[in-house]
A protein has these predicted regions:
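Active-site and substrate-binding clefts of carbohydrate-active enzymes
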Residues: 9-309, 313-316
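Short secondary-structure transition/capping segments
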Residues: 4-7
Length: 317
């Protein structure tokens, strides 16, 4: 939104994308006085060139475009940082990974670059500029974060007359389920875990490695001592509910134009799995109120009906 040199009073407006991406900026967190985070803003022009201008067909072209990001007008160590989808390197541009490897391994040092990362850069060069950022913004939605909750106008297009009004009731249904699962975890977690929040956050170690030894080590570190085998299974189910509840918000489920598409159907499958696992913990009916909200999510294709009919179909698979 705006920037200023640390210690100065006057702000500079950068709201139209004119921020200098070659340095870091310090953002002071208003809700937590004294705390801050150092931020980097990627070079949009070079990033777009990598993604859309076929730079990845030639490693030399790639390096030369990076060199274009250097300016003699800057009197500080310049950071050239870009942000592109990983699928650009091979999926969208065949052998793009080879062009990247050629550039990184053989050419960038010859061009005068030093390969680094954000952490190392900050250790060497402290942020001396302050930044205020735009609230609720994203790279793929001009309306903030509307793409993940509303019929904001952002979609993949290709179908004149279609709308994405289904996003809001879908979001409301998932939020309802998420809130129910948060309450469930907070209540039940105390029965199984030394520290429920730590167990939840570090469950990723099991997700990444589901071997017997990995699961055993995780349980020894985070489970309350003396749990029976049955209780351990319940505890693992509780953690899996939390994982599935996060998967419900997978971004591609909101990206496309139609609720019956495979991406959105997949996040409804995650929701179905959440409700399936939760049945052993709850006596209350979650499916009825969940489907009641989803019936407002109308498909653009008449034969698919609403989100409720899609969820019911998913639940039967």
């Amino acid at each position: 939104q705006r920037i200023r040199k640390q210690g100065e009073k006057t702000w500079q407006d950068v709201s139209w994308g004119n921020i200098d991406p070659a340095r870091s900026y310090r953002y002071y967190i208003k809700s937590a006085p004294g705390k801050f985070i150092d931020l980097f803003f990627y070079d949009g022009a070079i990033s777009r060139s990598v993604a859309f201008d076929e730079l990845l067909t030639d490693g030399n072209k790639f390096v030369n475009r990076l060199k274009d990001g250097i300016s003699e007008a800057r009197n500080y160590p310049q950071l050239i940082n870009i942000a592109t989808d990983g699928e650009s390197y091979g999926h969208h541009t065949k052998f793009g990974d080879m062009a990247l490897a050629y550039a990184v391994k053989l050419k960038v040092k010859d061009a005068g670059f030093e390969i680094t990362n954000y952490g190392e850069y900050l250790e060497k060069y402290r942020s001396d500029w302050e930044v205020e950022i735009k609230p609720v913004s994203s790279w793929s939605c001009f309306h903030g974060v509307g793409r993940w909750c509303d019929d904001c106008g952002c979609s993949t297009g290709g179908h004149p007359g279609w709308n994405q009004k289904w996003r809001k009731p879908l979001r409301n249904a998932l939020d309802f389920l998420r809130d129910e699962m948060t309450a469930l975890y907070n209540k039940q977690g105390k029965k199984f875990f030394k520290n429920p929040q730590e167990a939840r956050d570090n469950y990723v170690t099991v997700i990444l490695d589901r071997s017997d030894i990995s699961v055993k080590n995780f349980q020894e570190e985070y489970f309350i001592a003396g749990l029976s085998d049955e209780q351990k299974v319940k505890a693992m189910e509780l953690l899996e509910i939390q994982r599935q509840a996060m998967l419900m918000y997978t971004s591609c489920g909101w990206f496309f134009s139609e609720i019956s598409g495979i991406e959105t159907v997949q996040i409804m499958k995650y929701a179905a799995r959440v409700m399936q696992l939760a049945k052993s913990f709850l006596r209350k009916d979650l499916e009825t109120p969940f489907l009641e909200i989803l019936k407002e999510a109308k498909s653009n294709i008449p034969e698919f009906g609403t989100g409720r009919s899609e969820e019911r179909r998913v639940g039967k698979e």
